[in-house]
């Protein structure tokens, strides 16, 4: 078995990843499979922070399209991420992993608030820390929250788990001639306006010299291969 290249990682999971083949919500088989992929990495001693999206329940931008106030819609989206974080924490429990949920919004009867020092202590104790409610502020995506939390906890890399196996020159579902990048610089990704992550997240990671790897969470063993430094997905570098 290969040794892990990274000691501490920040994993960004989209809410849509939890849906599986369903149109909405959380698919039990899918979340169990994702936990299995994460457990394989945790069992190697890697410290794992997770930022979870909420698009399987509510997406702020979708709310604004119907005339909803943007800040209100974004706060609703943040609450959706807390629901996903709780579901993920329980799924970890069922597969034998110890996890803690921290929320950027105060919901203390349900989950504990985000406290950086406590999060780092949990990681050092071998617990998985799931960060809910994004940054706690409207107008910022959960991708930006992943860049922020990754920087705060001293992660060595941000791993963005998606439905596709990397960053493409165009949407591979719409353009059959689209090609996948093995590596791409932050500046090139920003200048090409590649939609896999927003520019704010790219810029923050670039400024902190925090690399990003974009890969498919549905490709068995892909997460472990990325953590072990094998060629998987697309690496975004400084």
Swiss-Prot record:
- Judged by the first EC level, this protein's enzyme class is transferase
Q: Which UniProt keywords apply?
A: ATP-binding, Cytoplasm, Kinase, Nucleotide-binding, Pyrimidine biosynthesis, Transferase
In which residues is UMP bound?
54, 74, 135-142
Q: What GO CC annotations are associated with the protein?
A: cytosol
Q: Where does ATP bind?
A: 12-15, 55, 59, 162, 168, 171
Supply one GO BP term. 'de novo' CTP biosynthetic process
Q: How does it assemble?
A: Homohexamer.
Q: What does this protein do?
A: Catalyzes the reversible phosphorylation of UMP to UDP.
- State the family named in the UniProt similarity comment for this chain: Belongs to the UMP kinase family.
PANTHER family from the entry?
Answer: URIDYLATE KINASE, URIDYLATE KINASE PUMPKIN, CHLOROPLASTIC
Q: What is the protein's given name? A: Uridylate kinase
Species name for this entry?
Dechloromonas aromatica (strain RCB)
**What is the phylogenetic placement of the source species in the record?**
Bacteria, Pseudomonadati, Pseudomonadota, Betaproteobacteria, Rhodocyclales
């Amino acid at each position: 078995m290969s040794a892990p290249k990274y000691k501490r990682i920040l994993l960004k999971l989209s809410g849509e990843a939890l849906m599986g083949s369903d149109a909405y919500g959380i698919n039990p088989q899918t979340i169990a499979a994702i936990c299995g992929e994460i457990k394989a990495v945790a069992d190697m001693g890697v410290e794992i922070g997770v930022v979870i999206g909420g698009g399987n329940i509510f997406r702020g931008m979708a709310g604004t399209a119907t005339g909803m106030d943007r800040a209100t819609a974004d706060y609703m989206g943040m609450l959706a991420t807390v629901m996903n974080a709780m579901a993920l924490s329980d799924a970890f429990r069922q597969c034998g992993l110890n996890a803690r949920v921290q929320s950027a919004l105060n919901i203390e009867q349900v989950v504990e608030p985000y406290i950086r020092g406590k999060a780092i202590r949990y990681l050092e104790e071998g617990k998985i820390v799931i960060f809910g409610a994004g940054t706690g502020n409207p107008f910022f995506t959960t991708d930006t929250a992943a860049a922020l939390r990754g920087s705060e906890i001293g992660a060595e890399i941000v791993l963005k788990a998606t439905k596709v196996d990397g960053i493409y020159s165009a949407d591979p579902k719409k353009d059959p001639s689209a090609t996948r990048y093995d590596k791409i610089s932050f500046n090139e990704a920003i200048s090409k306006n590649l939609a896999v992550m927003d520019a704010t997240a790219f810029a923050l990671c670039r400024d902190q010299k925090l690399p990003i790897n974009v890969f498919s969470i549905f490709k068995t063993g892909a997460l472990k291969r990325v953590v072990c430094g094998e060629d998987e997905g697309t690496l975004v570098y400084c």
